[in-house]
Amino acid sequence: MSESTTTIETAWLAIGQIVAPQGLRGEMRVNPSSDFPERFLIPGPRWLRRPRQTEPEVVELERGRAIAGKNLYIVQLAGITSREQAEALRGCELLVPASDRPELDEGEFHVLDLIDLSVIDQASSTPLGIVRDVVSAGNDLLVVELTDGREVYIPFVEAIVPVVDLAQGRIEITPPPGLLEL
């Protein structure tokens, strides 16, 4: 998995959302939508998109750290020094330029590339649905909207998802009995 899609064209990748202030000195909790922790740990420029805004503004990440046992990061942005200032940023998205996408190893994919791929039953070539999201868990789960409108979670493991063909816009699956009935 990797960064999630964002509603701002394809020039930006959403890497997380500010969910709450942390403490009294302007730190914030961020719910990541990126599998690349350096996005929250290494100081440097990031971009902030406020709700109902289309253009992001540049911000400087001063420092960040992971919260042990939780899928959250604590970040400090330059100029944010109080809990009230941090609270005002609740709901904002942190972004990076799409050109900052890290190179991936064979068999790894960016979430943005998986969204909207067709899902096909490999044995019968029957169209089953469309990938709508990817959820991080022990193994990543593909959130698939089936052709009948139901939503199912498909483990994103090679035994069940042997083919990901980005060029053809499709994923082939070999679902075990009962997986699509859950």
UniProtKB/Swiss-Prot annotation:
Protein name according to UniProt: Ribosome maturation factor RimM
Domain of life, per lineage: Bacteria
First-listed, main subcellular location of the protein, grouped into a coarse class: cytoplasm
Record keywords: Chaperone, Cytoplasm, Ribosome biogenesis, rRNA processing
Subunit structure: Binds ribosomal protein uS19.
Gene Ontology BP, a term: ribosomal small subunit biogenesis
SUPFAM superfamilies cross-referenced by the UniProt entry: PRC-barrel domain, Translation proteins
Span of domain PRC barrel: 106-179
GO CC list: cytoplasm; ribosome
Function noted in UniProt: An accessory protein needed during the final step in the assembly of 30S ribosomal subunit, possibly for assembly of the head region. Essential for efficient processing of 16S rRNA. May be needed both before and after RbfA during the maturation of 16S rRNA. It has affinity for free ribosomal 30S subunits but not for 70S ribosomes.
HAMAP family reported for this sequence: Ribosome_mat_RimM
GO MF annotations in UniProt: ribosome binding
One Pfam family hit: PRC_RimM
